[in-house]
């Protein structure tokens, strides 16, 4: 708003468009939270998209007949007439061996997941993917256990405060499982 952007509604999604207009790809360094999005840049005739740091929101894609087909679920790509369904034996073998796929490949040949912390541009049939975020682990061994506990507490409170900001109601479900 301070930089002259006019918002048409109260959706937090509109912030992405204005952030892209203002900062371009560097907008990703200013985002916090879970997201997967695509923006069409009509001036550059380029599709730009990204996935959140931890990959909470899914994003799948393929390139067929010079077009990028994408979605939050693989089934939407499978239904597209330009995609020819074929099993990916490499991904299947990895999954059956490790019970998890660490690769960007899926069970379907040519369909990939955009990895966490990655963004892409698609211009004139050419897909370019790059990593925009990587975790850093700088252990400060001079701190005491109590200092670490206080720092974690501060970070958790800060994170919860930031995630309460939304254009829809926010809630929390605690199931008593290990991830709650």
Language-model segments: which ranges?
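Cysteine-centered catalytic environments shared across enzyme families
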Residues: 1-180
